[in-house]
UniProtKB/Swiss-Prot annotation:
Protein name, per record: Sec-independent protein translocase protein TatA
Topology in membrane: Single-pass membrane protein
Presence of keyword Cell membrane: yes
Organism phylogeny: Bacteria, Pseudomonadati, Pseudomonadota, Alphaproteobacteria, Rickettsiales
Keyword Protein transport set for record: yes
GO terms under cellular component: TAT protein transport complex
Subunit structure: The Tat system comprises two distinct complexes: a TatABC complex, containing multiple copies of TatA, TatB and TatC subunits, and a separate TatA complex, containing only TatA subunits. Substrates initially bind to the TatABC complex, which probably triggers association of the separate TatA complex to form the active translocon.
Transmembrane feature ranges: 1-21
Keywords: Cell inner membrane, Cell membrane, Membrane, Protein transport, Translocation, Transmembrane, Transmembrane helix, Transport
Gene label: tatA
Amino acid sequence: MGMSFSHLLIVLLIIFVLFGAGKLPQVMSDLAKGLKAFKDGMKDDGSDNDNDKNK
């Protein structure tokens, strides 16, 4: 059972109320940077294991 469209709208509305319109772009930017860093870290982590197997 996943999130329906109405659940997503409710979550977005709560986020909008908590952070306000002025702070929301900064919060989303920080979130995107964090996700990108996480993905890059996961990518780097996998390549280290491949190098260890070849030795």
